[in-house]
Structure formats: structure tokens, C-alpha cells
């Protein structure tokens, strides 16, 4: 649209700018044509200006363009001079670069100032289209010249261009339509907002449109209204923050993804390093001389003042188990697809055997399952698992924070962020990281050597003897119902199935290894069973663990008589040898001490009623424990089905299973069916007899059993009486109802007989207790 524009040929009275000092870059506009005290270009009546936009990128916060543009200033001048259509009526006088706005002013001298400014402007643009200006500072943009209708203000304040321009009016207000028609020629407008009769806000879709409009129209007078324009200052950080908060559906998942990427890129390599260090150097640390010396000295202080025979300790037992060691070594050199399970009761030497076998292995990872699965608190489990694998750092406190963030996001945007890290998720993350490290260790030589003929799986198959070894000590098969234990078993199964590690499971449970086959695709486990030493070997073990001066014939005879009382459990034999060496005790005193200690432990653990303040109530009662103790003090074992006929155990076996888990008893199986019940340890048999032979304890426990049986009979009678009352309320009794009533009456009589018999026993036991001093 052809606008009737008025042009100002002289400088306005701008004395209010006369004392302004540049805030930064003090010699930015060192040009003879610029009046630096007011920031305006000096123009004669027959001179005019063109503004060429987009010569360089619009400056950012650091204003790098100012320095880079100086390198190309001469080249730009040549291109601009060549593109301008100089003629007899119009000559290019000078070029004033305006780096702050990304363009330049062209000062033009006319022979006679033109009346049709639109025609002149189009003529100049056509010339620039034919000879476009190209610059490496803005290679994908074509600069366009615009005729300047106002009086541009070349300030050097620390103000950067913005797409939003504020326009202040001096004179009558203008309508939104009129402002749109004036400024649309410089580019697309997003909005035109009238703020007040003296101001408006123009929002352009591009930055080049805003810079062109401001440099061409500042100081322009439309009718009687003069424009004063400035960029609206935009705090980009605040704007970005506002945008983030106003688009939570986008930003919250983006933040979650950023956290995930940061964790993966920053912390995962650190964690892998610590896990690898634990696997590679954990075994070596136990073999360091200083550590070994401290362990040896500590053990010797406890075991014996005699050090010269330390190397002979445990020699007899390992002579007989040499075949077991060779078998384990052979399995560890093979490419197995199943677990290696070492079974044996606690104290049978499973860990010592495995330590001897893996002593020369480079990469060994050890888990103490007793400590790992002893807690029901998942956070404690995660912490223990991280400690045993070497996983560090562990940010367990972030679980609660991420849960709160997820809840807040669901309430705010209606969907979850996906950043919640549960304890189960952390467990899997720890195990996955450990698995990755084990795989890299298993394939390390494959990467270092020229093994192009073998792929990774073939390499692992061929070099199975170099695979890392994972040891799960005290892994209880009967507790596979524990979800965390199942997760660890599944992870161990993956190690075996992928062939990246050998997995040894040391378990005190006898039998039950079939349950592990589900984790290795049904492959049968390699099982090694360790038992107690026979009497001859047990005697040799104790004898050869003593100094030579103590190995007398009298001692051998005494051991031959006394050792059968405690059996051949390796831990108990160590205790006897320690008592003989350190305390110079007799054999009978040493054996008596270990029996008394076990009897005291049984009394405190199984024969005392549960404390009222105890958080975890045992599922067995003292009378149930005493019943088993009494039976096993008289017999080597109890048939499981016979035990279930006892009134205290009849109808449920929870108590028996609980006593097995507490290691008071051991249950053997036949075809997955409970078969026989044995004492938990050989020494327990002697301890049971000692407890049963205590007249006061025996009488008190029999009283407890009698009272328990009376209570059970009373409850049964009460239930039968209630049913009889219901039958009586029916009125006329049919024959079937009469039979039921007769049955209930018979049961009541039978239970009453039980009560009578037990009350007589109570009287007898009470009288017996009175006679004991």
C-alpha cells in the first residue's frame, strides 16, 4: 500500500540524550556520519537511508557476531556497493554497519529527492535480487533493503533485538487496523496489541521483520502521530522457565528422560568400575600378606599360642575331600548350563572347600545370603546387595523423592512420568550392572586377542575355564518363596544360560535342588554333598590340629570315647581342638562345654515362651519343641508320618517346618515327600539327652505339654457343646441328627478322658517337683 510519508531532514531536539554515555563497547559506532551525542545519522535535505537486514545472525547474549563480522566487513562493503543501483540520480555515499541489529544502513544521495519513494525502494530491491549479497556469517539468508522513513536511533545500550516491539505515540492514537497496515510490509505480524492511547505492542513472527521495522520506522510521523519504538526486553531464562511450567505434559517427561540419560552417562561407568574392582580385586584383598597376617595372628590368639603347627590344621579332613576338590575344579573348567550346588549342613566345611578351589581364580564374586536375605526391609536388602556387589554410588533416598514427583505429575498432567525407581527396580539395576561387568570380564581376552574365527558365544564355550565365578553362600532352597531370593536365583540362572559365569550355590538344605532347575531351562544341577566326618577321621582331625607334645596315647583313647557325643561336624571339632589348645582342658571338659553350650542355646531359643515385646512371633511353641527333643533324645530319627500323629502336630506341619528353618531339626525327603526327622546337628542329640535328663526342666516342660493338651481338649469340647445346643434347638430329632448328637457326645467323653489323664499327670509332676531340692 502506498503510504503518504513525511520525511524529516533535520535532527530533532533530543537534548535529553545529549549527556548519555555508552554503557558498553564505547567505540562501536566510530563513524563520521553518526552524531554520537544523540545516536542519529546526519542527513542533508537530498539524502536518504536504506536498511539492509540479515547480513549476519542477530546477536546473542555473548555478542560474538560483533567480533566475527569485523573480519568480513570489507567484503560486505564491496558486495553492498556492487548490489546498489548507483546512477546519475542516485549515488551510494556510505555504509554504516549496524551489527547489533544484524544489518547495515546505506546512505544515499539523490540528485533530487524522489516523490515516489515506493518506486525507488522497489528499484533498489530489484537490483539486490539480481546481485544478491552473500556472507558466510549468514549463508542461508538473502539480505533485503528497506527504505528508512523515520529517524533511526543508533544507541549502543546493552539491548538485544526481540520479536516484540513496543511503539509509543506522540499525538493522536492509531487503531489496530492502521498499525497493521503500516507495519505489515516488514513481515508477518503475530499480534498487534493496543495497550493504551499512547502505546501499542507489535509481535512479529521473525526477528528480521522486527529489526527492519524498528530501524525504518523509529521517529516516523504518520499524520500528526510520531512513533518511538524500542525492543521489549525479554529475560530468556524467565521466558524459558515460564514455558516449561506452562507445558508440563512435555517438560515433566523430558526432565525424567534427562535424569535417566544423566544417570546412565555419568554414574553407570562409575558403578561398573566399582563392581569390576570388587570382582577382580576382592579375592586378591583376602590374599594380601598384611591382611592374611592380621587374620592369622587373630586366629592364633584365639586358637593357640603354638604357631609352628598351624600349617597342619585341617590336613586330615582335606585329605579325604581331595576328590571333592578335584570334582569342583573339573566342573569349573567345563561349559556348564546348570548350577553347581554344594550341599551340607552348617559347619560341614562347604565354604572352606570352595575357597580352596577358587583360590587361584582371577574373577570371583561372593554373596553372603544369610546377611543378604535376613531382612524383610527392601531398602536394607538393596543396600546390602549394593555393598556385596560393590555397586556405588547408590541413591536409595531418591526412591521416595521420585514417588512424590510421580504422584504430583499424575495429579497435574493426568499421567505418570515413569521416573519412579522402586526398590525392586534398583535390585534389578544392580544385578543388571553386575551382569554386564561379568560379561565384559568373561570376554576381555576375546577383545584383546585375535579371535575373529570365534564369535562371543563360541569363545565363552571354548574358554569356560576362564569364566568368572559367582558364589552364593548359605543360599537356602526352602526359602525360594522369598521374592527377592527368586530375583537373585533368576539372575544367577541368566548368568549360567548366557555362559558368562559359573554359579556355585552353597546350601545347608539337603535335597530340594530340583527347584533350581526352573531357572536354567530344566538342566540338571551338578550336586556335591558334604557330610560329617566319620569317628576315625574326626579323631585324626582333632589330634593333628594339636601340637605334637599334646598328641598322647591317653588323649587318643579319651577322644575315641568322647568324640561320638558330638559327631563329626567340622565346626564342632574345631571348637574342641580350640578348647584343648587354648585352655588346656581335658577332652571330657571340652566335649562337656560344647554340649552345655548347645543345650543352653536350645533352651533359650526353643523352650522359652515368646516375649510379649517380640516383633516376630515364632510359629512353634515350647511344647512342640520339647516333644521333638524328647523323641530325638531316645531315637536316631522320627518317621515324619509318625510325628504328624502326635496331638500337638496333627493336622498341620507349619511348626515342624519352622523348627527346621530354625535348625533344631533336619528333614530328609524321598521323592519330594518328607521322610525322616533328625536332630539339626550331631551334638544336638547329646544336648537333647542332657535337657531331658534335667529333672526340673523335664517336669516343667511336661507340665507345659499337659496344659497344652488340656487346652486343646477344652476347645474341642466347647465346639462340640455348641453344636449339640444347636441340634437341641431343632426340636424333634430325626435319626440322622441323633447319630450326629451321639457322635458329638462320644467325642466329648473322649476329650474329657484326655483332660482327666493329663490332670492326673499334672498332679504327679507337681508332687515330683516338690520333692526335688
Curated annotation (Swiss-Prot):
GO BP terms: mitochondrial genome maintenance
Domain RRM: 163-234
Presence of keyword Kinase: no
GO cellular component terms listed in the entry, alphabetical order: cytoplasm; mitochondrial inner membrane
Mitochondrial matrix topological domain residue ranges: 30-249
Compartments reported by the entry: Mitochondrion inner membrane
Main location: mitochondrion
Disulfide cysteine pairs (residue numbers): none
Taxonomy, superkingdom: Eukaryota
UniProt keyword Magnesium present: no
Side of membrane Mitochondrial intermembrane, spans: 271-773
Mode of membrane association: Single-pass membrane protein
Keywords for this protein: Membrane, Mitochondrion, Mitochondrion inner membrane, Transit peptide, Transmembrane, Transmembrane helix
Single Gene Ontology MF annotation: RNA binding
Transmembrane segments: 250-270
Transit peptide range per the UniProt entry: 1-29
Pfam families: RNA12 (PF10443), RRM_1 (PF00076)
Function according to Swiss-Prot or TrEMBL: Plays a role in maintaining the mitochondrial genome and in controlling the mtDNA escape. Involved in the regulation of mtDNA nucleotide structure and number. May have a dispensable role in early maturation of pre-rRNA.
Sequence similarity: Belongs to the YME2 family.
Protein name: Mitochondrial escape protein 2
Phylogenetic classification of the source organism: Eukaryota, Fungi, Dikarya, Ascomycota, Taphrinomycotina
Recorded name of the encoding gene: yme2
Amino acid at each position: 500500500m502506498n503510504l503518504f510519508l513525511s520525511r524529516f531532514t533535520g535532527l530533532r531536539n533530543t537534548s535529553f540524550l545529549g549527556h548519555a554515555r555508552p554503557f558498553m563497547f564505547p567505540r562501536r559506532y566510530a563513524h563520521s556520519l553518526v552524531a554520537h551525542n544523540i545516536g542519529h545519522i546526519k542527513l542533508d535535505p537530498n539524502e536518504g537511508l536504506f536498511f539492509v537486514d540479515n547480513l549476519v545472525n542477530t546477536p546473542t547474549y555473548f555478542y560474538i557476531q560483533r567480533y566475527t563480522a569485523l573480519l568480513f566487513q570489507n567484503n560486505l562493503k564491496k558486495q553492498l556497493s556492487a548490489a546498489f543501483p548507483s546512477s546519475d540520480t542516485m549515488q551510494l555515499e556510505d555504509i554504516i554497519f549496524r551489527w547489533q541489529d544484524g544489518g547495515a544502513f546505506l546512505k544515499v544521495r539523490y540528485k533530487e529527492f524522489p516523490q515516489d519513494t515506493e518506486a525507488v525502494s522497489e528499484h533498489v530491491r530489484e537490483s539486490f535480487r539480481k546481485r544478491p549479497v552473500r556472507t558466510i556469517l549468514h549463508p542461508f539468508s538473502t539480505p533485503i533493503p528497506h527504505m528508512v522513513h523515520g529517524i533511526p536511533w543508533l544507541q549502543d545500550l546493552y539491548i538485544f533485538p526481540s520479536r516484540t516491539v513496543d511503539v509509543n505515540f506522540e499525538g493522536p492514537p492509531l487503531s489496530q487496523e492502521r498499525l497493521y497496515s503500516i507495519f505489515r510490509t516488514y513481515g508477518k505480524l503475530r499480534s498487534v496489541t493496543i495497550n493504551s492511547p499512547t502505546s501499542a505492542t507489535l509481535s512479529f513472527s521473525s526477528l528480521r521483520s522486527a529489526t527492519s521495522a524498528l530501524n525504518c520506522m523509529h521517529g516516523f510521523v504518520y499524520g500528526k502521530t510520531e512513533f518511538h519504538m524500542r525492543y521489549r526486553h525479554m529475560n530468556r531464562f524467565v521466558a524459558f522457565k515460564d514455558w516449561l511450567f506452562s507445558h508440563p505434559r512435555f517438560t515433566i517427561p523430558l526432565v525424567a528422560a534427562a535424569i535417566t540419560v544423566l544417570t546412565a552417562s555419568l554414574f553407570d561407568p562409575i558403578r561398573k568400575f566399582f563392581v569390576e574392582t570388587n570382582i577382580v580385586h576382592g579375592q586378591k584383598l583376602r590374599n594380601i600378606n598384611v591382611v592374611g597376617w592380621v587374620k592369622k595372628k587373630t586366629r592364633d590368639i584365639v586358637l593357640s599360642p603354638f604357631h609352628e603347627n598351624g600349617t597342619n590344621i585341617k590336613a586330615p579332613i582335606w585329605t579325604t575331600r581331595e576328590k571333592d576338590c578335584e570334582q569342583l575344579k573339573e566342573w569349573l573348567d567345563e561349559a556348564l548350563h546348570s548350577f553347581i550346588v554344594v550341599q551340607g549342613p552348617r559347619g560341614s566345611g562347604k565354604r572352606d572347600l570352595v575357597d580352596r578351589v577358587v583360590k587361584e581364580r582371577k574373577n570371583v564374586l561372593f554373596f553372603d545370603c544369610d546377611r543378604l536375605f535376613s531382612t524383610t526391609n527392601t531398602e536394607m536388602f538393596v543396600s546390602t546387595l549394593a555393598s556385596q556387589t560393590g555397586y556405588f554410588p547408590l541413591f536409595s533416598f531418591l526412591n521416595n523423592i521420585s514417588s512424590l514427583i510421580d504422584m504430583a505429575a499424575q495429579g497435574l498432567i493426568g499421567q505418570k512420568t515413569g521416573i519412579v525407581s522402586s526398590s525392586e527396580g534398583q535390585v534389578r539395576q544392580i544385578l543388571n550392572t553386575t551382569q554386564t561387568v561379568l560379561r565384559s570380564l568373561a570376554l576381555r581376552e576375546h577383545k584383546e586377542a585375535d579371535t575373529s574365527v570365534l564369535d562371543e558365544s563360541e569363545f565363552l564355550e571354548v574358554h569356560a575355564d576362564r569364566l568368572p565365578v559367582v558364589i552364593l553362600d548359605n543360599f537356602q532352597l526352602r526359602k525360594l518363596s522369598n521374592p527377592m531370593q527368586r530375583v537373585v536365583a533368576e539372575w544367577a540362572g541368566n548368568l549360567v544360560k548366557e555362559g558368562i559365569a559359573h554359579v556355585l550355590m552353597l546350601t545347608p538344605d539337603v535335597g530340594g535342588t530340583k527347584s533350581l532347575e526352573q531357572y536354567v531351562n530344566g538342566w540338571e544341577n551338578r550336586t556335591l554333598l558334604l557330610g560329617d566326618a566319620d569317628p576315625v577321621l574326626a579323631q585324626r582331625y582333632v589330634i593333628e590340629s594339636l601340637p605334637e607334645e599334646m598328641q598322647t596315647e591317653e588323649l587318643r583313647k579319651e577322644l575315641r570315647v568322647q568324640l561320638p557325643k558330638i559327631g563329626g561336624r567340622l565346626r564342632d571339632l574345631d571348637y574342641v581342638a580350640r578348647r584343648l589348645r587354648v585352655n588346656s582342658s581335658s577332652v571330657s571338659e571340652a566335649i562337656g562345654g560344647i554340649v552345655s553350650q548347645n543345650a543352653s542355646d536350645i533352651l533359650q531359643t526353643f523352650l522359652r515362651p515368646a516375649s510379649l515385646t517380640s516383633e516376630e512371633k515364632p510359629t512353634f511353641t515350647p511344647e512342640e519343641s520339647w516333644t521333638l527333643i524328647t523323641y530325638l533324645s531316645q531315637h536316631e530319627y522320627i518317621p515324619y508320618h509318625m510325628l504328624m500323629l502326635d496331638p500337638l502336630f496333627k493336622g498341620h506341619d507349619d511348626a515342624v517346618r519352622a523348627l527346621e528353618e530354625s535348625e533344631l531339626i533336619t528333614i530328609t525327603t524321598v521323592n519330594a515327600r518328607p521322610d525322616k526327622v533328625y536332630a539339626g546337628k550331631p551334638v544336638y542329640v547329646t544336648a537333647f539327652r542332657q535337657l531331658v535328663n534335667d529333672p526340673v526342666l523335664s517336669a516343667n516342660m511336661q507340665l507345659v505339654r499337659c496344659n497344652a493338651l488340656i487346652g486343646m481338649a477344652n476347645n474341642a469340647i466347647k465346639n462340640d457343646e455348641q453344636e449339640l445346643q444347636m441340634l437341641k434347638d431343632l426340636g424333634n430329632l430325626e435319626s440322622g441328627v441323633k447319630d450326629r448328637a451321639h457322635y458329638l457326645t462320644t467325642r466329648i467323653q473322649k476329650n474329657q478322658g484326655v483332660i482327666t489323664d493329663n490332670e492326673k499327670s499334672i498332679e504327679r509332676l507337681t508332687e515330683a517337683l516338690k520333692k526335688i531340692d
